[in-house]
């Protein structure tokens, strides 16, 4: 009976060692849980970005307003009959009086 109890205690010690410091231990489990959470956050952000891009693609395929807006902003195109004005030096630094 004594041998049986000693064997159980040794097995319990080995299992505890494996649980706390072996492969697939609890500390490793918690690190992996943090990595999974970070990856899921990144995936959620990328899914939102993909949804915005899908909506933009649908908008570009279906209507001319989005194409016209992009042409105006990115290519500087102007409608017939409009006058184009360019403001030069619009970003002036405001200087405060020195003391």
UniProtKB/Swiss-Prot annotation:
GO terms for cellular component: cell division site; cell septum; plasma membrane. The chain crosses the membrane at residues 4-21. It is a single-pass type II membrane protein. GO terms for biological process: FtsZ-dependent cytokinesis. The keyword Cell inner membrane applies. Residues 31-73 form a coiled coil. It is found in: Cell inner membrane. Residues 22-99 are periplasmic. InterPro entries: Cell_div_FtsB, FtsL/DivIC. Keywords: Cell cycle, Cell division, Cell inner membrane, Cell membrane, Coiled coil, Membrane, Transmembrane, Transmembrane helix. It comes from the Bacteria. The keyword Cell inner membrane applies. Residues 1-3 are cytoplasmic. Part of a complex composed of FtsB, FtsL and FtsQ. Belongs to the FtsB family. Essential cell division protein. May link together the upstream cell division proteins, which are predominantly cytoplasmic, with the downstream cell division proteins, which are predominantly periplasmic. NCBIfam families: PRK00888.1. This is Cell division protein FtsB. It comes from Shewanella oneidensis (strain ATCC 700550 / JCM 31522 / CIP 106686 / LMG 19005 / NCIMB 14063 / MR-1). The lineage of its organism: Bacteria, Pseudomonadati, Pseudomonadota, Gammaproteobacteria, Alteromonadales.
């Amino acid at each position: 009976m004594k041998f049986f109890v000693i064997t159980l205690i040794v097995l319990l010690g080995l299992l505890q060692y494996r649980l706390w410091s072996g492969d697939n231990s609890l500390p490793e489990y918690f690190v992996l849980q943090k990595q999974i959470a970070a990856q899921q956050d990144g995936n959620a952000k990328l899914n939102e970005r993909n949804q915005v891009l899908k909506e933009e693609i649908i908008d570009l395929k279906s209507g001319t307003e989005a194409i016209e807006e992009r042409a105006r902003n990115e290519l500087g195109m102007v409608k017939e009959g409009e006058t184009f004005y360019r403001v030069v030096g619009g970003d002036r630094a405001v200087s405060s009086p020195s003391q």
